[in-house]
Swiss-Prot record:
GO terms for molecular function: structural constituent of ribosome. Coiled coil: none annotated. Keywords: Ribonucleoprotein, Ribosomal protein. Signal peptide: none annotated. The gene is rpmC. It comes from the Bacteria. SUPFAM superfamilies: Ribosomal protein L29 (L29p). Belongs to the universal ribosomal protein uL29 family. It holds the Pfam family Ribosomal_L29. This is Large ribosomal subunit protein uL29. One of its GO terms (biological process) is translation.
């Protein structure tokens, strides 16, 4: 997900996406441990998406707090 797509979504949608990404990340970790994961590059994509979502959510919280 790119930053423009993330910022255009509501906070509720971002929370749902965040939960799904975290579940997918955990599943990839288990697959890697069992040597069944063939798409290692997906790890970094998921981690970066999670970081972008958390950054956007924290920015919104700070803006609401300061408003």
């Amino acid at each position: 997900m790119d930053i423009a797509d993330i910022e255009s979504r509501s906070s509720q949608e971002l929370h749902e996406i965040l939960v799904n990404l975290r579940k997918e990340f955990v599943n990839l970790v288990f697959q890697k441990k069992l040597a069944q994961c063939n798409n290692i590059s997906r790890f970094s994509l998921i981690r970066k998406s999670i970081a972008r979502i958390l950054t956007t959510l924290n920015k919104r919280r700070r803006e609401e707090k300061n408003a």
